[in-house]
Structure formats: structure tokens, C-alpha cells
Amino acid sequence: MKTRLIIFLMCLFAWFSGADTHAQTDVKHLSWGKVANNMPTEWYNSEQARNIADQLLARQMDCGGWQKNIPYHHLLTDAELAKVRRTGVGATIDNGATTTEMRFLARVYACCGDARYKDAFVKGLHYLFEAQYDNGGWPQFNPPRGKAHYSSHITYNDNAMVNVLRLLREVSENDSPFDGLRLSDSLREQAQKSFDKGIDCILKTQIRIDGKPTVWCAQHDEKTFAPAPARAYELVSFSGS
């Protein structure tokens, strides 16, 4: 009996040691996209993942979106967090921003059930709804980066709209990891309607030559649907990017 108890305690100690080691995985060398989407499922229940989620809450802009090209898994100090700007221009769907952060929060919430993470996700979802034009398209930034700036164009470049549409479809169909959020039927229905409008916009912006549908530009004018330029080297073209 004593031998069995010793073996049990040794196994229990080994399990906790292994869990702690796994929870403190070195993620700094990984990309933010990898950390947000491709870690082992159990890792999203770790203290390390929750610390990152807490940073996402602190760095979510007041409009509900997030800024781009930021390695959110590199944690800031309290002093640095106090200087983070949460208002004005900055929230975007460019380069995977906002949708990536929402996916991460959904995964962490599914594991730990902290309501703050769900609330932040829902706030991000409303940001996507509000940023969508009546014609179904999304600008690169919302609010846009200045008057007559290309960031107000309907943006396909860098999978901006595709990332949003994919997330909305998965939310509406209650796919993983969003099923763990237990979103209301009304929210999922709104996601479906937003998705449908987005698909309709894609059809409207397709370039037609002699009445025949062809391809798309990287961005299109939000009012006329015509191909539109962006940066100086991103001219109107029959291209994807």
C-alpha cells in the first residue's frame, strides 16, 4: 500500500512539473499569429496565455479593434501599458489585425471561462459590424487614416476582407473555437448577414470587360466599386496585390 502511494505521489509530481514547464513555453521567438492560432489546445488554459489575454484587453482600442503589426505576446510592463493609446486612428483589419486577437481571446475563453475575454471578443465583433459599409465592404482602417486616404477603400489586399469573412462565417456556424463562447443566436445571425453582405460586395466589385466578369484589384473605391490605387507603387490594376 505504501509503495503504491509513493508511486502515485511521484507520478503526480511529474505531471505537475510537466504542466508547469508546458505552461511557461518560450513564445517570444514565435510569431504572434502562431501563438494566437497554433499552440496546443491545453496551452490556452495556461497562466501564460491568460497573461497575454489580459494584455489584449488593455490594448484593445475603445472602438473595439486592435492595431496591426504588434507582437502582443511580448508583454508590456504596467508603466508601458499606461502609455498605450486607445483612441483615435489605429484599429484595422490589415495584416490580420483584430481578427487574430479575437481568435486568441476565443481560445482562451473556451479554456478558462473568464467573462472579460468574451466581452472583449464581442466588442471586437461589433467593431467589425460597425466598420462594414452599407454596400458590404470593409475599409482597411476604421476610422480611416485621414480625409481621402486609401485606407477608406474596400480592401482585399493582404486578405483583409477575407480574414473578416472567414471569422464571421465560423462565428455564424458556431465553429471552433467560437462555439466555446456560446454566443447568442442574434449575434450569430448578425454575423451571417454581415458575411452575406460581404460576399455580395465581392461580386459587385468584380472587374467586367465587355460585360464579362474577370478579376479584382487589391482595393476598390468604396462608392463606385472601381479599382482604386493605394500606396505610390500600388496602382490601379487587374491583380490581387
Q: Residue spans of the language-model regions?
A:
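Carbohydrate-binding/catalytic loop surfaces
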Residues: 71-89, 139-159, 212-239
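Low-complexity, Ser/Thr/Pro/Gly-enriched N-terminal "stalk/linker" regions
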Residues: 24-88, 209-212
